[in-house]
Amino acid sequence: MAELNTHVNVKEKIYAVRSVVPNKSNNEIVLVLQQFDFNVDKAVQAFVDGSAIQVLKEWNMTGKKKNNKRKRSKSKQHQGNKDAKDKVERPEAGPLQPQPPQIQNGPMNGCEKDSSSTDSANEKPALIPREKKISILEEPSKALRGVTEGNRLLQQKLSLDGNPKPIHGTTERSDGLQWSAEQPCNPSKPKAKTSPVKSNTPAAHLEIKPDELAKKRGPNIEKSVKDLQRCTVSLTRYRVMIKEEVDSSVKKIKAAFAELHNCIIDKEVSLMAEMDKVKEEAMEILTARQKKAEELKRLTDLASQMAEMQLAELRAEIKHFVSERKYDEELGKAARFSCDIEQLKAQIMLCGEITHPKNNYSSRTPCSSLLPLLNAHAATSGKQSNFSRKSSTHNKPSEGKAANPKMVSSLPSTADPSHQTMPANKQNGSSNQRRRFNPQYHNNRLNGPAKSQGSGNEAEPLGKGNSRHEHRRQPHNGFRPKNKGGAKNQEASLGMKTPEAPAHSEKPRRRQHAADTSEARPFRGSVGRVSQCNLCPTRIEVSTDAAVLSVPAVTLVA
């Protein structure tokens, strides 16, 4: 019952301190109360003065030391389980002891409870106050497990002052407390107890490695990189500001000249109205003068009836009227509008001013050690840009090259019959000579081109098949060596008989030479030229060589 009362008193004291200091956590209040022996006034004064931060820092430092001691003296604590059991069984005088030892002894006592479950029945009454104590201490133990978060927040605030060590201490202490709470009860495995402590050290080293890498990168380069990043970000902001300023200036210019335009229009309207008034005034003056002249004219008509005095007065009036005619002239010639346009133009040209940006930036010559790096970077960037340009330009010729082999492959396909027929004609020259003396063959040869000419006139060249072109080329190519052979035989036979034969033989030679040159052209030209050169000579040679072929046929048969 005493322990329950003390627990209730602790809660009341925590609430009392929290009512004065509402922004502090229960963990911090418990630690400060334990430091001042649960004196509420001293704890509140410590929070108000700010000395509670130092108290919490001391708690963290002592927790680190106790954690280290606990790591080193695990075996000693297992040996002194009986002493700890006796301490737990005693009624607790007050919660003046620090809580980390209580948590440390809690699982130890729990282990002894399990180990002493086989004891005699006279020990069972002793277990009842211990269970009460465990139930009482459950909430403070949870509070101490939650101390780590509060301490981490405090130490993060303190780390800004340049003390990162307490943060590491709190983490080690919290890890040690949780590990001791979850520790198995078997004392015969000390290696398993120390393994979680060893596993914390590589994590600490891994956390330090990025800082070490940053230090290796350069002692002060990180600050420079941050400054450069801020400056580059501000450049985009200034660019937006310039655009906004230019837009606002354009709007101001439009507004100013619109106002000037409105002012000019208003002035024009006022001047036009004033000119109308001037016109009316001048006309009134002239009408008055006109009436005066008419009146004087009427008086002059009555001069015969007037006395001398009246005539003298009339002459004086007329003289005065005539003497004022110069004013009439001035009234007619006077310029009613005058304006110094040049001055106004000068004022308009001087109206408004635009401030141009000043390039106050200075170029700093880089150090000689940085020049190779800058040149290499510029060279690599230039190569990449050139490579991108070349790759973009080579895409189109590659397509043309991909299409050209098809055209090239079509050239041999169309010219293959001529290539194939020429060696065949050279090898089988004797057979061709034998075959050309067949009258049926000559009739077919002479009639075939005529038919082909008729069919060519009826249908378009695009409608003709490749087989028809090949059929025309083969007899045409086989027909040329016959002309050559016929010319040679003609020279041999008619050279001795008649002198007229050489004249006939020169004509086939010229035609043969023209045909040979036409055969060589298709290999250099396009496909269209091949078909044209193979078709046109057939139509010419068949009609002209018919008479020439009859001469060797007669001579050789004889």
Swiss-Prot record:
Which residues are recorded as modified (Phosphoserine)?
Answer: 120, 455
Compartments in which it is found: Cytoplasm; Nucleus, Nucleolus
| Basic residues: bias regions | 63-79, 469-485
- How far does the signal peptide extend, from start to end residue? none
**SUPFAM superfamilies associated with the record:** UBA-like (SSF46934)
Report a single Gene Ontology molecular function: RNA binding
> InterPro entries annotated for this entry?
SPATS2-like, UBA-like_sf
Task: Cite the residue spans of the region called Disordered.
Answer: 63-134, 157-201, 380-525
Which UniProt keyword terms apply here? Acetylation, Coiled coil, Cytoplasm, Nucleus, Phosphoprotein
Positions the record marks as coiled coil are 271-344
Start-end of Polar residues biased regions? 381-390, 410-432, 440-456
Q: N-acetylalanine (modified residue): where? A: 2
GO cellular component terms, A-Z = cytoplasm; cytosol; nucleolus; nucleoplasm; protein-containing complex
Question: Among its keywords, does the record have Nucleus?
Answer: yes
**Biased composition, Basic and acidic residues: where in the chain?**
80-92, 513-522
Family the UniProt entry places it in: Belongs to the SPATS2 family.
Under what name is this protein listed?
Answer: SPATS2-like protein
